[in-house]
Amino acid sequence: MKLNNLPSEFQEALPILEKIKAAGFEAYFVGGSVRDAILGRPIHDVDIATSSYPQETKQIFSRTIDVGIEHGTVLVLEGKKEYEITTFRTEEEYVDFRRPSQVSFVRSLEEDLKRRDFTVNAFALDEEAQIVDLFDGMTDLENRTLRAVGIPAERFNEDALRIMRGFRFAATLDFEIEPTTFEAMVQTAPLLEKISVERSFIEFDKLLMADFWRKGLRAMIDSKAYNFLPDLAGKSDELEAMLTSLTEEFRFSTSEQAWALLFVCLGIDNIKSFLKKWKTSNDFQRSVVKLVEIYQLRQAGPVTKQICFKYGKEFLYLVEELHQAQGFVTDFAAIDKIDQALTIHDKHEIVVNGGHLMKAFDLKPGPVLGELLKEVEFQIVEGQLENEEQAIMTFVKGILENE
């Protein structure tokens, strides 16, 4: 079969394939980019596989970088573009369910494609736009089916992260997982405990951000694979609640929004501790905590000036989107109105700081100074005090005189 419309990303990379072929070797576009081209989806990374060994690849191109040469990968710099070119390879036993004990370079495309995870990721595309499909992936694409290459249990034993990738592909492609493949996922799910948490987080996060995230999460719940992810063991009811609490068409705007809803459904108090186990960044943790706090505040009452000032309009909007999808009363207009009425949006905009107050009133650092600054901030946000030096000094003087 021939791909009728070769995407521009492939067209730009054709000279790479042609140079390798001119040197006497085979070269193909491979992997998910070929699948996406067939489906008419946007292409992200263009991966190239070749029969040339790494040292041979380096002789073909003048500008190369060894980015993973022990695994057969050479980065080729061509013009302003960079391309990862990987030698056809086979992989020996996976000793830790993540990495092969040994990689062997081969000249056979078929041997290379055999080690791929799913049939829809095992395509190759040559310079004439001919699709190489050795595992009937085209039929699976047409049937919107996710099927492991070869014996499913072997694929997941080789790299247990493929289980999470399977859920993610179901969510991004809107595919059904083929029954034998799904059963192998169920049986090998305990191996997820062997996978680095960071890698599992990336796949789970991509799942939640996908258009068909419900399908991926449904598969994860049905497989009980969540039992082998950090702090999710026994949480099937809570994960079900995440599925049922939102309108069918809802899509998450940000990762932080998705994880915030997860925590709302899980009912977890120590969110930072949970996210630390998932090895997330401090910024991510802080953002998710803020969203959960806002969610709880909105459950208790309307948005106030203090809430808007503390968290900012963008965060309030994200929570309001969740509320809207859950059928609660929302008021985006009120958030806009309050935000526009604020005379400051950050405490650093206040014209008087602690140093000014210490000098003017002979104060020392401590609780008294802290409370004064908080009260000044509160009154400015409420619109009861002008953000002007003389007005603030008079206000503080009045407080101190009345103590």
Curated annotation (Swiss-Prot):
Coiled coil: none
Oligomeric form and interacting partners: Homodimer.
Cofactor(s) needed for function: Mg(2+)
Keyword annotations from UniProtKB, A to Z: ATP-binding, Magnesium, Metal-binding, Nucleotide-binding, Nucleotidyltransferase, RNA repair, RNA-binding, Transferase, tRNA processing
Uppermost EC category: transferase
PANTHER family per record: CCA TRNA NUCLEOTIDYLTRANSFERASE 1, MITOCHONDRIAL
Function: Catalyzes the addition and repair of the essential 3'-terminal CCA sequence in tRNAs without using a nucleic acid template. Adds these three nucleotides in the order of C, C, and A to the tRNA nucleotide-73, using CTP and ATP as substrates and producing inorganic pyrophosphate. tRNA 3'-terminal CCA addition is required both for tRNA processing and repair. Also involved in tRNA surveillance by mediating tandem CCA addition to generate a CCACCA at the 3' terminus of unstable tRNAs. While stable tRNAs receive only 3'-terminal CCA, unstable tRNAs are marked with CCACCA and rapidly degraded.
Binding site for CTP: 32, 35, 116, 159, 162, 165, 168
Pfam families according to UniProt: PolyA_pol (PF01743), PolyA_pol_RNAbd (PF12627), tRNA_NucTran2_2 (PF13735)
Residues involved in Mg(2+) binding: 45, 47
Biological process according to GO: RNA repair; tRNA 3'-terminal CCA addition
Binding site for ATP: 32, 35, 116, 159, 162, 165, 168
Protein name listed in UniProt: CCA-adding enzyme
Remaining remarks: A single active site specifically recognizes both ATP and CTP and is responsible for their addition.
Annotated EC: 2.7.7.72
Family listed: Belongs to the tRNA nucleotidyltransferase/poly(A) polymerase family. Bacterial CCA-adding enzyme type 3 subfamily.
GO MF term list: ATP binding; CCA tRNA nucleotidyltransferase activity; magnesium ion binding; tRNA binding
Lineage per the UniProt record: Bacteria, Bacillati, Bacillota, Bacilli, Lactobacillales
Catalysed reactions, semicolon-separated: a tRNA precursor + 2 CTP + ATP = a tRNA with a 3' CCA end + 3 diphosphate; a tRNA with a 3' CCA end + 2 CTP + ATP = a tRNA with a 3' CCACCA end + 3 diphosphate
